[in-house]
């Protein structure tokens, strides 16, 4: 009898289910380390459960956020430095949640690639777990999509989904008024926005990713991959202390576009650009690209990753609390009648 012809398998089509299962087993310990009150189930089910009552909520309102990391991924892929890109993913979601006054509760990720490379994927998701643990947020599920023909070799994409909660009536912004003080919390670099511009500037400079960074630190690639700061525990401590009226996460759109998102109609903000020093990375970007200051201010965080809008009579106490939490805090301006953001002084 002729030998039976072997049929086509899913693996022959480029999808390795065994590799996907191996990834889940490898990341389970990291996910378990993110467990918090309210966590009911682990990875592997059709859905993940979370118990709001066990998390201590009486009359909760849920808040959801989703985001990605943009073209910062391209630098991580090209350099092979993927260990912290997951922290960026978490930060972009949970920092947004706290701006609504919510405590992050749980997180899910979506990881898509053309060919699953187990070590690469595990390093990325372990970074996600690290970000979750640092922000008190349980990593309770996710999706790994192996899609042959959709991505070049080694390429991948990430998306994150975070859910938080607050007691009814505790949402932010609330009570913002003229005279409120703006406290700026320092960023540690570009964070996760503006990287299409960053990559264009690097191209113009002629520098390779492994070249020494022209603005200090390690190689250029590693310096630009510094993970987005997590402001969750510090910001929530300030909110619970009383007097905080709003929080603004300074992401795409910079100071110019993000601060007005938390100001009610009829109110604007005045910011003193001389209150803090522009970090070297932004000065290098601006000088290399001959970038005008207004463009810089509506593209990057310019050294301020989160703004806390606080009642004037609580500003000193909240600043002291944030400093005790390890923050570098700068009084950068105030809320004024009007609209939009106006600037005094110069950054460049």
Curated annotation (Swiss-Prot):
Its EC number is 6.3.3.1. Keywords: ATP-binding, Cytoplasm, Ligase, Nucleotide-binding, Purine biosynthesis. Pfam families: AIRS, AIRS_C. Signal peptide: none annotated. Pathway: Purine metabolism; IMP biosynthesis via de novo pathway; 5-amino-1-(5-phospho-D-ribosyl)imidazole from N(2)-formyl-N(1)-(5-phospho-D-ribosyl)glycinamide: step 2/2. Its main location: cytoplasm. It comes from the Bacteria. GO terms for cellular component: cytosol. GO terms for molecular function: ATP binding; phosphoribosylamine-glycine ligase activity; phosphoribosylformylglycinamidine cyclo-ligase activity. It is an enzyme of class 6 (ligase). It is found in: Cytoplasm. GO terms for biological process: 'de novo' IMP biosynthetic process; adenine biosynthetic process. InterPro entries: PurM-like_C_dom, PurM-like_C_sf, PurM-like_N, PurM-like_N_sf, PurM_cligase. It catalyses: 2-formamido-N(1)-(5-O-phospho-beta-D-ribosyl)acetamidine + ATP = 5-amino-1-(5-phospho-beta-D-ribosyl)imidazole + ADP + phosphate + H(+). NCBIfam families: purM (TIGR00878). Belongs to the AIR synthase family. This is Phosphoribosylformylglycinamidine cyclo-ligase.
